[in-house]
């Protein structure tokens, strides 16, 4: 297999860099700093001598400032997967030797090669791209001729003009790295908006061999045995038995496309923070690689918790107490908010209504989903909002909860993310860790679909949290006002399986043709209905207080 790839805006990412250079070099004023690359280009072209300004800016970005360009998320994984399968990869770029109007004569090609070298493209122990497989062309015709000469099976480019060029080889599959352009149907082009999508398109699922290669690349340890573990809704986990006879957890995170927060960065730094504050019933960090979105941790031996008991609950309370105590440490202030933190009633309502809107956007494909949302969920939600805003303490209705009443939270806390050892529970999964309202932690623990707490356990947990956070005079009132809200929120979370991004990430509809997908979606819808019924019961109890 031979795969050809364009360079600029396909491998190298310049979105932020164009705006930063435009600001520093005086092309734009600070009030335009929120522009993206396309908006910046369009703005400059409308100015006097705008096309010249745009070409000058391109020359600066691709030359003098090339070292500040980013690597496209997911590309490193893709390249390593090619290596595992012995696929030949070629970079073919339309890049002149020097930039337009560049009086300093900076070689654009030399800067591109330096950038690839600094990103370890040519390191045989890492990305392992051959230097001789990088080609620069003076014009588009020469680029297309090189693609034809190489006889690529696939070529990936962000510019449709490459594929519509008269000389483009007809047997080469065309992949446009964009979802914003269209090419006439006779050119038989496939559209993919990110490297994860291209990865899925060409390779399908990540293999154990892929993860073993990544593990060796960042640890310098060989892999004796690797096993993929059952996944939840988040990252992929692998158990690695290494050549040093130690066992590790290799966690493969979603890439950072669409400016998503790095889950790797959040989890790895959070665990390091907890370790530094003497929290021991967690995994330990080993090494991470943000280019590969790969974190390596100590493997935690033990059993999953199928049925919790009172001792488990007490250990969960103790862990929350530890987090609350270290929230007061001086270095805790440098941690960010938990993912989807809810620091006010307005935050919570806004999050739920955004989820409603996302699900409503796909109801043309799912009549049963539309009927549920329109006939059952939304009317109940509207009743809740009208009531709960009056019941919610005014101090955190619209404004954020005061910092002294916030706590550090895993934000996905429960026995589904704990391992039982002989003498203790070890808590895992800190991808969403950060500052939050302890009311959210309390309510999520009770509402999470994996918890299944009975009435007695729920009452014990609720009372323990009220006692723990008793310094907050509004904690109990806020909890009672918000509990139905959080139940409704979970009713929407279980419906994520209807969303296209979930389907793409978990490869449901494209791989299942046996009716199991429809069965699974029906099951999630039934869970959502159960949440609504439970919320109505809980809501009636709140109103009667």
Task: Specify the residue positions occupied by each region the protein language model found.
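Substrate-recognition element of Asp-dependent hydrolases with the DxDx(T/V) motif
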Residues: 66, 70, 75-116, 134-137
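C-terminal cap/substrate-recognition subdomain and adjoining C-terminal extension
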Residues: 104-210
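Active-site acidic catalytic loop and adjacent metal/ATP-binding pocket
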Residues: 227-250, 389-442
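Active-site activation/catalytic loop segments of kinase-like enzymes and analogous catalytic loops
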Residues: 438-473, 484-504
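ATP/Mg2+ or Mg2+-diphosphate-binding catalytic cores
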Residues: 492-545
């Amino acid at each position: 297999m031979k795969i050809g790839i364009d360079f600029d805006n396909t491998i190298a990412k310049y979105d932020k860099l164009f705006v930063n250079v435009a600001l520093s070099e005086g092309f734009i004023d600070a009030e335009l700093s929120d522009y993206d690359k396309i908006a910046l280009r369009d703005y400059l072209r409308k100015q006097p001598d705008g096309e010249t300004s745009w070409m000058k800016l391109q020359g600066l970005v691709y030359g003098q400032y090339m070292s500040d360009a980013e690597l496209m998320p997911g590309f490193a994984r893709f390249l390593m997967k090619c290596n595992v399968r012995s696929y030949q990869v070629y970079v073919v770029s339309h890049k002149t030797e020097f930039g337009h109007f560049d009086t300093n004569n900076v070689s654009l090609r030399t800067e591109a090669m330096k950038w690839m070298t600094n990103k370890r493209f040519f390191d045989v122990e890492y990305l392992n791209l051959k230097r001789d497989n990088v080609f620069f062309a003076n014009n588009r015709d020469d680029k297309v001729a090189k693609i034809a000469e190489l006889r690529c099976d696939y070529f990936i480019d962000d510019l449709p003009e490459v594929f519509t060029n008269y000389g483009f080889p007809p047997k080469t599959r065309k992949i446009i790295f964009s979802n914003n352009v269209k090419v006439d149907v006779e050119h038989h082009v496939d559209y993919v908006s990110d490297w994860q999508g291209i990865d899925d398109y060409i390779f399908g699922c990540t293999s154990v061999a892929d993860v073993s290669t990544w593990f060796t690349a960042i640890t310098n340890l060989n892999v004796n045995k690797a096993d993929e573990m059952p996944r939840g809704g988040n990252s992929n986990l692998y158990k690695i038995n290494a050549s040093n006879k130690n066992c590790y957890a290799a966690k493969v995170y979603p890439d950072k496309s669409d400016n998503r927060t790095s889950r790797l960065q959040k989890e790895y730094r959070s665990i390091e923070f907890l370790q530094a504050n003497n929290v021991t019933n967690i995994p330990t960090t080993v090494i991470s690689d943000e280019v590969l979105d790969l974190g390596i941790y100590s493997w935690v031996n033990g059993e999953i918790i199928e049925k919790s008991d009172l001792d488990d609950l007490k250990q969960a309370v103790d862990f929350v107490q530890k987090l609350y105590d270290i929230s007061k440490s001086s270095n805790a202030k440098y941690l960010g908010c938990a993912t989807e933190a809810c620091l006010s009633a307005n935050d919570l309502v806004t999050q739920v209504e955004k989820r409603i809107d996302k699900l409503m956007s796909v109801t043309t494909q799912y009549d049963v989903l539309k009927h549920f949302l329109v006939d059952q969920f939304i009317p109940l939600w509207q009743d809740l909002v009208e009531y709960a805003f009056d019941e919610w303490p005014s101090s955190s209705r619209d404004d954020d909860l005061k910092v002294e009443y916030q706590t550090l939270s895993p934000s996905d806390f429960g026995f589904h993310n704990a391992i039982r050892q002989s003498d203790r529970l070890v808590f895992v999964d800190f991808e969403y860790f950060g500052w939050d309202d302890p009311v959210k932690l309390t309510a999520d623990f009770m509402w999470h679909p994996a918890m299944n707490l009975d009435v007695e356990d729920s009452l014990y947990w609720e009372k323990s949290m009220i006692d723990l956070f008793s310094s907050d005079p509004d904690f109990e009132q806020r909890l009672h006002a918000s509990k139905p809200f959080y139940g409704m929120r979970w009713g929407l979370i279980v419906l994520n399986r209807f969303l296209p991004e979930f389907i793409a990430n978990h490869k449901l509809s494209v791989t299942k043709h046996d009716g199991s997908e429809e069965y699974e979606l029906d099951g999630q819808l039934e869970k959502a209905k159960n949440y609504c019924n439970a919320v109505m019961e809980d809501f009636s109890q709140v109103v009667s207080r």
